């Protein structure tokens, strides 16, 4: 497999320049170790489509190498016994270190099935306040340092406004021990081996691979900003303890994939990613440990098909 070193100019502005202007920023990037990029155009059509598999997402052997365009997922929270009981036995490891090992194993399988230049978008909530634990940082370390993904950035998902959010403010109106309250989660974005999608669009069309964009230009401008305001989903309405809103995977799908691409969610839950895929003309593959949630997701996906 051929490799190439990333060393290209960009069109971003210099630090301290208020307007956007073209320039060669290689001097800035020269201060960091250059990532090794894979010059690999291997893309395999995915034979497993529009299916939710019941099983452990550390084993994605049913999915071939280099066949997935995008992984978008929200792993189960490491959030305590009540939540873990609702998810079912074995869904969340007992210790935080075991939890990170589980995520690493899943993301390693995601690397295998992603096509070169395929993207992964991981929605995570940071943990606790005594002390605070940055799960976003730990996931970034796993993706970048352990597995070799190329980090593309981090989106801040704003779930509420102003004085909303939880009421655990610590010492109210006092400097004794004020506590920051969560209004946001993170979406860590990374790529497999290269920043661009493997195979040029003109070649994709000739080979019968997905090549058509569907994103609206106004949406593109809004969604390439690193803050997204999206209302959270109702757990009671969906029937799952922690569903992310369908709008979140929909934006990732429109932004990072072509019409007809296959999207994977290794923690499918109530089927939000599959619903977003159906509504945007993409295929989906899901993995879910709990058969009851597989059935729930399949019902909700079918409802989405019927309503479109």
Q: Regions from the language model: what does each represent?
A:
Residues 292-308:
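Cysteine-dependent PTP/DSP-like catalytic domain, specifically the C-terminal lobe
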Residues 1-296:
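Core catalytic lobe of class I
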